[in-house]
A protein has these predicted regions:
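N-terminal hydrophobic/helix-forming segments and targeting peptides
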Residues: 1-459
């Protein structure tokens, strides 16, 4: 079964919509390089679209009615948006669920040290990375520092044109004979992914003068002392903006497209759909790259607790009503898929691979060898989605992650399926997934948004 290239179907009006969506997407990537920044930007866009913090309804004990738009935030790192439908919540919701964390380097709690005239920040990598990809790149620092007095300082260094950037150094080729004999996963050791941040000594300082200069600069700009690193969350990410890629500008090159490409298109679809019959939900969560753990990951009770609040405000606040709502819901686990790469064709089985420019991808299952750890969607649900996408003239394709036993991966789908709801993975194909700079097709971004709109309206 061959899938058509979406580009060949676009008229001038389609191209205008496509370019507008992708311009907004690039801006979202630039403004959201961490999960906190993504939540902040999502709240801004939601409030502009008329969404109100659910806490306001709870404090005022205000009843929810069809058409109401609310959002809930969990610890500034996860967000759930809802538009109340005309049908009872116990009949289920239509959920788009993506994650907004991405692989990166995290600064350790006691990170700052000086070594032979250089100052470094010690890091611990987050998520699945090829460690050697992170050396000799311009890097930026994003995050927050929480002081003992309760003040929380936002930190972004390396994005403004006048900012310095940072990097992890590498061994010169002339002395790399031994290094290059090592397996790829040990060519650069995790403990060597330390960020070079300074080399100038502070005048009239005898001991650790370079470190002293770094601390002075941090204190001058942010009021940060060395002990404040103990209560900081600082993330090291590639510096620079999302860019159009290719002579034809048909692709996007950017950091964090896994999974912010699906997060953004889910958010846009959520804000676009009006007056749904079934309640709509857009769920953007944290910690997927390390197992969806913690209070802001999908395994927490944030979503379930928020649904309980909605039901209570809608006059259906019983445990049984919550269970019925969850079990009757349908979900697209909006997560990316591996795009077929001709340079690494041996890793893919072409009949069941995702291709650039052919639309959103449906992954009936993910997992590893033998489908281990997978959510395997039901055939009936796949059939229903086929009808929804075809009726909405969405370009879509099906795929597995790669050849059997070559590798594997997982998403939040299996977690949500524990409620008994129908769940399937559905997202955008990505080249160079988990690299510092990933690639997507503008056409697939556009088709994903179309698919998510169709799902919210008709699932």
């Amino acid at each position: 079964m061959e899938r058509k290239t979406a580009w060949n179907e676009y008229k001038k009006k389609d191209m205008k919509k496509l370019e507008k969506l992708n311009a907004g997407y690039r801006a979202f990537l630039d403004n959201g390089k961490t999960e906190r920044e993504c939540v902040k930007e999502s709240v801004r866009q939601a409030e502009e679209a008329g969404y109100v913090n659910l806490d306001t309804y709870v404090k005022e004990n205000r009843a929810l009615k069809p058409g109401d738009k609310v959002y809930a935030v969990c610890m500034k790192k996860a967000i759930a948006l809802f538009q109340i439908g005309t049908r009872p919540l116990t009949e289920g919701t239509n959920i788009l669920g993506a994650h907004i964390d991405s692989p990166r380097l995290d600064v350790k709690q006691n990170p700052l040290y000086e070594d032979n005239g250089f100052t470094y920040l010690d890091t611990h990598y987050y998520g699945g990375i090829k460690k050697w990809q992170w050396v000799t790149l311009p890097l930026a620092i994003h995050g927050v520092v929480a002081k003992k007095n309760g003040e929380v300082v936002d930190v972004v260094i390396g994005e403004d044109d006048n900012d310095p950037v940072f990097c992890v150094t590498d061994l010169l080729i002339h002395l790399s004979r031994e290094q290059q004999t090592k397996p790829a996963n040990t060519v650069v050791e995790g403990e060597n992914l330390d960020l070079l941040i300074g080399s100038q000594p502070l005048e009239e300082t005898e001991k650790e003068a370079v470190k002293a200069m770094t601390l002075k600069l941090l204190n001058d700009k942010y009021g940060i002392e060395e002990e404040d690193f103990l209560s900081a969350e600082l993330e090291i990410v590639p510096a620079g903006k999302a860019r159009e890629l290719g002579m034809d500008a048909s692709m996007i090159l950017a950091y964090g497209q896994d999974d912010r490409v699906c997060a953004y298109t889910s958010l846009v679809a959520m804000l676009e759909v009006e007056a749904p019959e079934k309640t709509s939900c857009c769920l953007l969560v944290d910690k997927e790259e390390i197992g969806s753990v913690g209070a802001t990951g999908m395994q927490s009770h944030f979503f379930e607790n928020t649904m309980a609040e909605l039901l209570a405000l809608a006059g259906e606040g019983t445990e049984l009503a919550l269970r019925r709502c969850l079990a009757s819901s349908r979900m697209l686990s909006s997560d990316v898929s591996a795009a077929f790469d001709p340079l690494y064709a041996a890793a893919f089985e072409k009949k069941n691979a995702a291709f650039f420019g052919k639309g959103i991808v449906i992954n009936k299952f993910t997992g590893a060898g033998g489908k281990s750890g997978s959510n395997d969607a039901n055939a009936e649900y796949v059939g229903a989605l086929r009808a929804i996408f075809d009726d909405a003239k969405v370009n879509w394709q099906t795929a597995e992650l790669g050849k059997v036993d070559v590798g594997g991966g997982g998403t939040i789908a299996y977690i949500m399926s524990l409620y008994g709801m129908e769940v399937i993975d559905s997202g955008v194909p990505v080249l160079s997934m988990h690299a510092p700079w990933e690639v997507t097709s503008k056409a697939d971004v556009y088709e994903a948004k179309k698919a998510y709109v169709a799902f919210l309206k008709n699932a």
